[in-house]
């Protein structure tokens, strides 16, 4: 009996501790230029509007990353982001919507749990997973004050990119809110638009949840996500990389093997069949050589004549 009471007390303590660490929920968007199969399956696993635990969210992210089909894995933290922002002010996310709409794989989650531990570690475990799984050795960190002046790298090495955007202030003034969203949307476009490769995977969320309330049935960027069929995964950008980066033709020797070159035999039949052509080639060659010889002889005579004239003139001047 005492043992059972101890177990119950332990469970209640863990629940209370978890609740004390929970600081809210944030929406999340995941998308990839190239097809990342398996993402759509999670739509059936998560109830619409339900809070998705951080562990489950990380599992979805790892599924997206594990295909290693991107030249840049981008993690975006947008402090102060609310579900209402992505629903009520969807038009202000002009460039984010465009990136989602033109992706091959995309998913959104309305509510992902955020704890104090998550705020401290943020994308740390996912960054480590991406670098280990996809053999990525370089990481670029872009702080809020660098978002406006970011200059892209020019090398072609795969990278993990961490973007920390300026915070959305918890203002309910519609005009101010729209201006903040539009400004950060432009900042994100400035960064993503300068990446040397169009093949990217992006995870966009917030580790500093907003306290602004959202409608219970709010949808994330509905116009952007409506283009996707949740029952069919389709590669929509199969030609994008080839069109953006024209490749070089592989070297191929004219003859693969000298031993395979068939020798031309000047037999009687060959000579009879090609007598006219061979005669024309021979005559043309002789005439060409004769013409070259005459030209050379003529130039030689002109040089000798000019030399003699110059000598005569010098002699006359001397007298």
Curated annotation (Swiss-Prot):
PANTHER family membership: PROTEIN BIG1
Gene Ontology BP annotations: (1->6)-beta-D-glucan biosynthetic process; cell wall organization; fungal-type cell wall biogenesis
Keywords: Cell wall biogenesis/degradation, Endoplasmic reticulum, Glycoprotein, Membrane, Signal, Transmembrane, Transmembrane helix
Gene: BIG1
Region (Disordered): 297-319
UniProt keyword Signal, yes or no: yes
Main location class: endoplasmic reticulum
Family stated for the protein in its record: Belongs to the BIG1 family.
Lumenal side: 19-269
Cysteine-cysteine disulfides: none
Function: Required for normal beta-1,6-glucan synthesis.
Name the record gives this protein: Protein BIG1
Gene Ontology CC: endoplasmic reticulum membrane
């Amino acid at each position: 009996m005492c043992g059972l009471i101890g177990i119950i007390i332990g469970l209640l303590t863990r629940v209370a501790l978890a609740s004390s660490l929970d600081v809210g929920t944030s929406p999340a968007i995941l998308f990839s230029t190239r097809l990342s199969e398996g993402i759509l399956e999670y739509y059936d696993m998560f109830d619409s509007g339900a809070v998705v635990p951080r562990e489950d969210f990380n599992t979805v992210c790892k599924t997206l990353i594990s295909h290693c089909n991107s030249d840049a894995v981008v993690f975006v933290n947008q402090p102060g982001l609310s579900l209402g922002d992505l629903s009520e002010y969807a038009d202000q996310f002009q460039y984010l919507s465009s990136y989602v709409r033109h992706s091959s794989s995309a998913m959104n989650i309305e509510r992902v749990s955020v704890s104090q531990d998550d705020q401290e570690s943020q994308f740390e475990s996912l960054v480590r997973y991406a670098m280990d799984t996809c053999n990525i050795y370089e990481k670029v960190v872009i702080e809020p004050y660098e978002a406006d002046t970011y200059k892209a790298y020019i090398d072609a090495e795969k990278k993990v990119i961490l973007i920390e955007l300026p915070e959305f202030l918890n203002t309910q003034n519609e005009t101010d809110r729209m201006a903040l969203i539009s400004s950060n949307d432009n900042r994100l476009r400035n960064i993503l638009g300068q990446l040397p490769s169009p093949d990217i995977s992006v995870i966009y969320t917030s580790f500093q949840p907003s306290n602004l309330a959202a409608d219970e049935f709010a949808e994330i960027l509905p116009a952007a996500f409506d283009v996707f069929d949740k029952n069919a995964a389709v590669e929509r950008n199969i030609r994008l990389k080839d069109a953006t980066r024209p490749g070089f033709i592989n070297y191929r020797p004219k003859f693969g093997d000298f031993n395979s070159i068939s020798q031309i035999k000047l037999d009687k039949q060959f000579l009879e069949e090609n007598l006219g052509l061979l005669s024309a080639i021979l005559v043309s060659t002789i005439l060409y050589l004769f013409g070259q010889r005459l030209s050379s002889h003529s130039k030689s005579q002109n040089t000798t004549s000019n030399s003699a004239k110059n000598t005569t003139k010098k002699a006359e001047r001397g007298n």
